């Protein structure tokens, strides 16, 4: 039973969506025309009629009418017609509104959390985006009245879906082409801005002097400094002579190690000056490579 109920609910939702699409796509021109004409008529009434005075006039007219009928009927008939034939119970507005209010209250904490994060700049990027959006809305509503915006939105709601559905492929191709052109233009403008600002940045860097060098040395990636060091150490390791490999001898009786016939050679003296010169040369090469990588 639960599965059938869920299936029926899904069908109802799909039918509602299809009805809304059919309404906006003018599948039934008579029904769509009624809604479109009614919305335009309501907007024209809102523009021409002062709603506050209108509702006040309707309210005091109803009260004067019901009071007069009740008084006259009690005076001549002995019983008030309004109290006799009027509704005895009020419509259950609270029961109708309560589910919607409960659903809205469930979503309220999430909305409050988003507002708190935005106001207190937990993510500054999102805060700036929201500020820019509110600024644009402020300018937009200062240029146009609310009635004009609602009137244009109503016309677009009943015309744009039908136009897009009729020329979908052409509109999609045009939008994709416009996006590509905008990307190219933004890249060109960014490159132009970089080229124009480069001389000023170079001047600032030259004026700062050692401060800019210090910042570069701190912000340089580790890989750029590790590369020359490993290369120089590998060069130093290549310059150092390796010890000769010892010959492997088998334990068989046929192959025996030869007895040395000559006297052992004397040990060579260790020259400290040559070693210090080599170390100085290697450090100079390392400094040159580091300067080239930083430049």
UniProtKB/Swiss-Prot annotation:
Q: Where are the transmembrane segments?
A: 51-73, 143-163
Residue span(s) of domain Reticulon: 20-220
Q: Name one GO biological process term.
A: endoplasmic reticulum inheritance
Please give an example of a GO cellular component term from this record. cytoplasmic side of endoplasmic reticulum membrane
> Which superkingdom is the protein from?
Eukaryota
Q: Which residues fall in a coiled-coil region?
A: 265-295
- All ranges on the Lumenal side of the membrane: 74-142
Q: Which UniProt keywords apply?
A: Coiled coil, Endoplasmic reticulum, Membrane, Phosphoprotein, Transmembrane, Transmembrane helix
Q: PANTHER family per the record?
A: RETICULON (PTHR10994), RETICULON-LIKE PROTEIN (PTHR10994:SF193)
Q: How does it assemble?
A: Interacts with POM33.
Name the UniProt record assigns to this protein:
Reticulon-like protein 1
Which species is this record about? Saccharomyces cerevisiae (strain ATCC 204508 / S288c)
Q: What is the lineage of its organism?
A: Eukaryota, Fungi, Dikarya, Ascomycota, Saccharomycotina
Q: Which gene encodes it?
A: RTN1
């Amino acid at each position: 039973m639960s599965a059938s109920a869920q299936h029926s609910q899904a069908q109802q939702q799909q039918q509602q969506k299809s009805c809304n699409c059919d309404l906006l796509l003018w599948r039934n021109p008579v029904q769509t025309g009624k809604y479109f004409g009614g919305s335009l008529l309501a907007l024209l009434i809102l523009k021409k009629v002062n709603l506050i005075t209108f509702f006040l006039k309707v309210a005091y007219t109803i009260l004067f009418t019901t009071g007069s009928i009740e008084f006259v009927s009690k005076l001549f008939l002995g019983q008030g017609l309004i109290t006799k034939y009027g509704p005895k119970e009020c419509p259950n507005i609270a029961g109708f509104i309560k589910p919607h209010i409960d659903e809205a209250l469930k979503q309220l904490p999430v909305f409050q959390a988003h507002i708190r994060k935005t106001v207190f700049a937990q993510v500054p990027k999102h805060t700036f985006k929201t500020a820019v959006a509110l600024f644009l809305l402020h300018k937009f509503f200062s240029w146009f009245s609310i009635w004009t915006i609602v009137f244009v939105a109503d016309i677009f709601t009943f015309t744009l879906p039908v136009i897009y559905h009729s020329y979908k492929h052409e509109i999609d191709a045009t939008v994709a082409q416009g996006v590509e052109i905008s990307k190219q233009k933004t890249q060109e403008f960014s490159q132009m801005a970089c080229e124009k600002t480069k001389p000023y940045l170079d001047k600032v860097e030259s004026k700062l002097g050692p401060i800019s060098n210090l910042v570069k040395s701190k912000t340089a990636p580790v890989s750029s400094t590790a590369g020359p060091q490993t290369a120089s150490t590998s060069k130093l390791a290549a310059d150092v002579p390796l010890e000769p490999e010892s010959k492997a001898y088998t334990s068989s009786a046929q192959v025996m190690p030869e007895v040395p016939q000559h006297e052992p050679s004397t040990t060579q003296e260790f020259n400290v000056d040559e070693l210090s010169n080599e170390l100085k040369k290697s450090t100079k090469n390392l400094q040159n490579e580091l300067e080239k990588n930083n430049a």
